[in-house]
Structures are given as C-alpha cells and as structure tokens.
Amino acid sequence: MDWRHKAVCRDEDPELFFPVGNSGPALAQIADAKLVCNRCPVTTECLSWALNTGQDSGVWGGMSEDERRALKRRNARTKARTGV
C-alpha cells in the first residue's frame, strides 16, 4: 500500500498545506498544518518524498518551505565537507 493512503492529511482541506507567504496569517496556517503532520504515521515518508521530488511549496512531512530549504542547504554543506 502506498504511504499516501495512510496520511492523516487526506481528510483535510489541501489548501491548509499551501499557505500564501511566510508571515502573519500564513504562519498560523503553517502551524495548523504542522499539527496535522504531528498526528500522522507517515511523516517521514512524506518528507522524504517531498525532498526527493523537489516539492518547493507547501508543508510536507511536518516541515515548511523555509525549513526544507534550510535542511537541503545543511545536507549540501555536510556532503561537500565530508564527500559523502
């Protein structure tokens, strides 16, 4: 079975996970989306999928757009430093 069938967000309005902006009301929307992610049994799979498929917008796997960008930068620096 595909991990998406187990995702808690399937029963939520998809708009919740795609806030416009990253300040003011969008911050509250991001926090609400993360609350859904916190209840989800497939957060790890979701985040991995988002990173592997280049999902640049929205909340995926409990991480906002900015958080995923920061994670990608950290991973790239680690890879450059260690050669792994």
Curated annotation (Swiss-Prot):
<comment type="similarity">
    <text>Belongs to the WhiB family.</text>
</comment>
<feature type="binding site">
    <location>
        <position position="37"/>
    </location>
    <ligand>
        <name>[4Fe-4S] cluster</name>
    </ligand>
</feature>
<keyword id="KW-0963">Cytoplasm</keyword>
<dbReference type="Pfam" id="PF02467">
    <property type="entry name" value="Whib"/>
</dbReference>
<keyword id="KW-0004">4Fe-4S</keyword>
<dbReference type="GO" id="GO:0051539">
    <property type="term" value="F:4 iron, 4 sulfur cluster binding"/>
</dbReference>
<dbReference type="GO" id="GO:0045892">
    <property type="term" value="P:negative regulation of DNA-templated transcription"/>
</dbReference>
<keyword id="KW-0804">Transcription</keyword>
<keyword id="KW-0408">Iron</keyword>
<feature type="binding site">
    <location>
        <position position="40"/>
    </location>
    <ligand>
        <name>[4Fe-4S] cluster</name>
    </ligand>
</feature>
<dbReference type="GO" id="GO:0035731">
    <property type="term" value="F:dinitrosyl-iron complex binding"/>
</dbReference>
<dbReference type="InterPro" id="IPR003482">
    <property type="entry name" value="Whib"/>
</dbReference>
<keyword id="KW-0238">DNA-binding</keyword>
<dbReference type="InterPro" id="IPR034768">
    <property type="entry name" value="4FE4S_WBL"/>
</dbReference>
<dbReference type="GO" id="GO:0071731">
    <property type="term" value="P:response to nitric oxide"/>
</dbReference>
<dbReference type="GO" id="GO:0015035">
    <property type="term" value="F:protein-disulfide reductase activity"/>
</dbReference>
<feature type="binding site">
    <location>
        <position position="46"/>
    </location>
    <ligand>
        <name>[4Fe-4S] cluster</name>
    </ligand>
</feature>
<dbReference type="GO" id="GO:0047134">
    <property type="term" value="F:protein-disulfide reductase [NAD(P)H] activity"/>
</dbReference>
<protein>
    <recommendedName>
        <fullName>Transcriptional regulator WhiB1</fullName>
    </recommendedName>
</protein>
<dbReference type="GO" id="GO:0003677">
    <property type="term" value="F:DNA binding"/>
</dbReference>
<feature type="binding site">
    <location>
        <position position="9"/>
    </location>
    <ligand>
        <name>[4Fe-4S] cluster</name>
    </ligand>
</feature>
<keyword id="KW-0479">Metal-binding</keyword>
<feature type="domain" description="4Fe-4S Wbl-type">
    <location>
        <begin position="8"/>
        <end position="70"/>
    </location>
</feature>
<comment type="function">
    <text>Acts as a transcriptional repressor, inhibiting expression in vitro. Probably redox-responsive. The apo- but not holo-form binds to its own promoter as well as that of groEL2. Oxidized apo-form and nitrosylated holo-form also bind DNA. The apo-form has been shown to act as a protein disulfide reductase, but also not to act as a protein disulfide reductase.</text>
</comment>
<dbReference type="GO" id="GO:0045454">
    <property type="term" value="P:cell redox homeostasis"/>
</dbReference>
<dbReference type="GO" id="GO:0046872">
    <property type="term" value="F:metal ion binding"/>
</dbReference>
<keyword id="KW-0805">Transcription regulation</keyword>
<keyword id="KW-1015">Disulfide bond</keyword>
<keyword id="KW-0411">Iron-sulfur</keyword>
<dbReference type="GO" id="GO:0005737">
    <property type="term" value="C:cytoplasm"/>
</dbReference>
<comment type="subunit">
    <text>Homodimer. Interacts with GlgB via an intermolecular disulfide bond.</text>
</comment>
